[in-house]
Amino acid sequence: MRPSCASSSSSSASPSLRLSSVTVAVDKATSELLRTPDWTIIIAICDSLNSNRWQCKDAIKAVKRRLQHKSSRVQLLTLTLLEAMLKNCGDFVHSHIAEKHLLEDMVKLVRKKGDFEVRNKLLILLDTWNEAFSGVACKHPHYNWAYQELKRCGVKFPQRSKEAPLMLEPPPPVTQSSSSSSMNLMSIGSFRRLDETMATEIESLSLSSLESMRNVMDLVNDMVQAVNPSDKSALKDELIVDLVEQCRSNQKKLIQMLTTTADEDVLARGLELNDSLQVVLARHDAIASGVSLPLLLQAPEPRETSSSLKTCGAAALESADSESSSSSSSSESETDEVEDVKDDFIQLAKRHALLNALHSDEEEETLLLGNDNEKTAEAEAKTQCKDLALFDTTTTTTTKSEQDIIELLSLTLSTTALPSPQTQPQTQHPSFFADDNILMNSYVVPWAQSQEEPQVPKMTQFAPSGPQFQPWPLQQQQPYSYGYPQPQWSGGQVNSNDTTFWSQGGNENMVFERNLQVSNSFPARATGTSGAATAATVDRQP
């Protein structure tokens, strides 16, 4: 009959915790890593038992198993959970506790004389339950039996505090019509008592557990500092894992305490402890994830006094202000230097612009004196220069200071001294001895070397595609003296006008004014077929 009722109740109500999750919830609520009770899980367990009574059996089994744990911390957390279940659940929980021999296990723990806190907690609970369930119409005599058994053994129960809430007595029988309203009132009363219990726990935490939290944090910090940052496996040690989990749970409880406390001293210490916990946990997480440790994740120094903290904070603020002022002054000095440099560039540019304006008239006059050929040559040269120095349109935009430097350099190059033009225009003619027409590279005697070409008039072409030649004026030719003595048989100067050469491709005679080499004077031989060859005659005296 019981399983059928359980199945019907489970089908009608939606359970907040499944059958398998009740045991897991009990294990979490009594974890060895917890320093104080986790009331969120405890409330969830009580709600699940009130909505699904068939889960009470599994919950009591899990509590009995956790009560046999070797750790005194686990035993204390288990007793706290058991007390909350008796206060916030109905008669079905009281019956299961009495039937599952849980009270006998509690008596055995008292007789063992183990941990003092655990033994004291057991005696207080048994004394409270005996007072709550005693009377003429006692439904659960097991609680009275446990109390009397310890009394016969000579155990002295501690004096209970008058402010401690008494055990919730079983509700009187009510009719079915008013069952829903009475259940609501009972749940409201139970939650009020639960809130009072949580408030007392949080208040005791705020006054007594800050130092223990700091000790655990310092221990974790020392272990994390001793670990090699490149070795992740060192953080998998069981002791380090337990301490880190304890720090995380302490941080959660600390945040809850800070939201409810009104003491300024406790609030200041709690905030400081919270910051230190965040730094230590962040350092641990950085090493565990293999991320490089930031400079800010340094070990928190131990707290000395509130006055030392205030002085350190004031010194930090002063150093931050000095750094900010120095950085602002350095930035202002840099901007002033940049502005001074820009002003110098602007002044230089204006100076060069004035110089260009002064010399612009002279340059225009000299440029207007050039002939058409010079203009054509200059145009070709400019086009060649433009072809060589192509403008890169993909050049990135420079800053304002770089543009000023470029403009200054361009002004400096534009103001360089130009070569003075000739007073008379000179016509460019291709020469017979031009570099483009020389076909061989031979030695040239000194008297045949190229001299400074004077202005020559335009001469006729002796071939359709050949270069043009014209005799040079005699009045502009200056004789060249080589310092050689005249021969004995030479009676006078060599007549340069009698020296004549016959051109190869034309019928015109081309006369060159030069000093002849006397020792190698031979008559020229005719090479053409169109006319008779004329020998070059030289006046010499024997």
Curated annotation (Swiss-Prot):
Residues 314-332, 524-542 have a biased composition (Low complexity). One of its GO terms (biological process) is protein transport to vacuole involved in ubiquitin-dependent protein catabolic process via the multivesicular body sorting pathway. It is a peripheral membrane protein. Preferentially expressed in flowers. The modification Phosphoserine is found at S161, S521. CDD domains: GAT_GGA-like_plant (cd14231), VHS (cd03561). SUPFAM superfamilies: ENTH/VHS domain, GAT-like domain. InterPro entries: ENTH_VHS, GAT_dom, GAT_sf, TOL_plant, VHS_dom. Keywords: Membrane, Phosphoprotein, Protein transport, Transport. GO terms for molecular function: phosphatidylinositol binding; ubiquitin binding. Might contribute to the loading of the ESCRT machinery. This is TOM1-like protein 7. The gene is TOL7.
